[in-house]
């Protein structure tokens, strides 16, 4: 029998953004157009100066131009685009500079509020700058005075985009080409937080005055039922309550409704901005203490401290007529109020696993 040894977890592997993929493929295709040879890899420089060699799946002539493709490698990050083919189709243009186009699988901006104008292909500013810089250097090396027409595409991007926030943000037809550093850090969650900020910005730019930030589908459904809010007003915050609350400091709305499962809201009430179990946990003694302030018996408090889950503690409290759900929401509102500007009206709702409302706290405003 093989002797057991302690597991030594391997370090998580970083990957490359779609912006890096778009840069590498644009450079390879443009180089071929300007007399270069077909190669199976291309070197690019990332925004912070790192040089990386990216493998190409193909680099070939295409219609009146050239095209190149690479497989997106997200490393150990759970990225929806991992393994997708990102490609660039490049033609020479008469005017200097780069004109960008949305190829198959890349979306187009249809709503104001993003960093790109309505009608623009969803190729974000930093990837655009990376492509422009590399093609300008190539043109200078080859003595080429014209410009480039660059279309970026992602195979299957239209279908993959349905798994992202793009449809809600008004980016239609495909994915966005993203990245600020060129590198995907495993579990950094930066893209998700950026999508939360974009969701708020798009809602504001389209005249939405009341948004609901929700931890999941059940809480979104609860807010739809209560207010009939349009999709653009529903912000899928997941575990990142802090991303919503802090962004409202510089991008306020008239009213914010926070809604989530009772356990998530109890974490917010306890002063946590990241509601994921990796970063915060349910504080059952704290729940028992709040129940005590509402007149809970000593026996109930002891029972709540020994509960297996927050839902069990909530059920125990409600069985004795202790309005723990409302109290937790009130504590969460008080904590959030310390972050959000006073001009933003706040309310907090908690739901159970069936989506039923189990607590609420709403500010009264004259």
Swiss-Prot record:
Q: Does the UniProt entry include the keyword Transmembrane helix?
A: no
Task: Check the record and name the Gene3D superfamilies matching this protein.
Answer: CbiD-like
Looking up InterPro entries in the UniProt record yields:
CbiD (IPR002748), CbiD_sf (IPR036074)
Supply the alphabetized keyword list: Cobalamin biosynthesis, Methyltransferase, S-adenosyl-L-methionine, Transferase
Note the PANTHER family from the entry. Answer: COBALT-PRECORRIN-5B C(1)-METHYLTRANSFERASE (PTHR35863:SF1)
Stated name of the protein: Cobalt-precorrin-5B C(1)-methyltransferase
Which reaction equation describes what this protein catalyses? Co-precorrin-5B + S-adenosyl-L-methionine = Co-precorrin-6A + S-adenosyl-L-homocysteine
Q: Which family does it belong to?
A: Belongs to the CbiD family.
The alphabetized list of GO BP terms reads: anaerobic cobalamin biosynthetic process; methylation
Q: What is its EC number?
A: 2.1.1.195
Gene designation per UniProt = cbiD
- Which pathway or pathways does this protein act in? Cofactor biosynthesis; adenosylcobalamin biosynthesis; cob(II)yrinate a,c-diamide from sirohydrochlorin (anaerobic route): step 6/10
Q: Name one GO molecular function term.
A: cobalt-precorrin-5B C1-methyltransferase activity
Does the keyword field hold Cell inner membrane? Answer: no
A Pfam family annotated for this chain is CbiD
Q: Where are the annotated coiled coils located?
A: none
